[in-house]
Amino acid sequence: MGGGERYNIPDPQSRNASKNQEQQNRQKSKDQNSSQTKIAHKKKERGHGYNPAAAAWQAMQNGGKTKSLSNNSNWNAGLSSPSLLFKSQASQNYAGAKFSEPPSPSVLPKPPSHWVHVSLNPSDKETMTFQLKTLLKVQV
């Protein structure tokens, strides 16, 4: 036979007791949170908190300009002529590959000798060349 399998059958009374405890704990945490938010609102009413509306109003009064950026002459000089930032980059030549032109065959590496069978008939070479060209054909 099975040999002592045990099943945990929950007691309905203990389940209700744990639910009551959870509800009481939730109620306590809600009470604590609401008292903390009330304190925070009172602090803001006294003028100790940060008021984003006041900061926005002050920014409108200043014409949307911040004082810290207007005092920094280096920052303004860089912004007044953005073409100076890219001038040195544009004068340099790009040394990378040009993808508009295919590379010449002399530049391409040779395949290893064991890849290509040495004794090929000329017709086999032509067939292989045709197949390779069709495989490598790039559609524009």
From Swiss-Prot:
Q: Give the matching InterPro entries.
A: PNRC-like_rgn, PNRC1/2
Per the record, where are the segments of Polar residues compositional bias? 11-38, 59-81
| UniProtKB keywords | Activator, Cytoplasm, Nonsense-mediated mRNA decay, Nucleus, Transcription, Transcription regulation
Q: Report the record's Gene Ontology biological process terms.
A: nuclear-transcribed mRNA catabolic process, nonsense-mediated decay
Keyword Nucleus attached: yes
Summarize what gene deletion causes: Mice are lean, resistant to high fat diet-induced obesity but without the induction of insulin resistance and have a higher metabolic rate than wild-type mice.
- What's a single GO CC term here? nucleoplasm
Motif extent (SH3-binding): 100-106
Tissue-specific expression: Strong expression is detected in lung, spleen, ovary, thymus, and colon.
The answer to whether UniProt assigns keyword Cytoplasm to this entry is yes
Predominant location of this chain? nucleus
The record's Pfam families line, in alphabetical order, gives: PNRC
Cystine bridges: none
Protein origin, superkingdom = Eukaryota
Compartments annotated for it: namely: Nucleus; Cytoplasm, P-body
Region spans: Disordered: 1-81
Per UniProt, subunit arrangement is:
Interacts with UPF1/RENT1; preferentially interacts with hyperphosphorylated form. Interacts with DCP1A. Interacts with many nuclear receptors including ESR1, ESRRA, ESRRG, NR3C1/GR, NR5A1, PGR, TR, RAR and RXR.
Record's function text? Involved in nonsense-mediated mRNA decay (NMD) by acting as a bridge between the mRNA decapping complex and the NMD machinery. May act by targeting the NMD machinery to the P-body and recruiting the decapping machinery to aberrant mRNAs. Required for UPF1/RENT1 localization to the P-body. Plays a role in glucocorticoid receptor-mediated mRNA degradation by interacting with the glucocorticoid receptor NR3C1 in a ligand-dependent manner when it is bound to the 5' UTR of target mRNAs and recruiting the RNA helicase UPF1 and the mRNA-decapping enzyme DCP1A, leading to RNA decay.
Q: Which family does it belong to?
A: Belongs to the PNRC family. PNRC2 subfamily.
Q: What is known of its domains?
A: The interaction between PNRC2 and nuclear receptors is dependent on the SH3 binding motif.
Q: What is this protein called?
A: Proline-rich nuclear receptor coactivator 2
Per the UniProt record, the source organism is: Mus musculus (Mouse)
Encoding gene per record:
Pnrc2
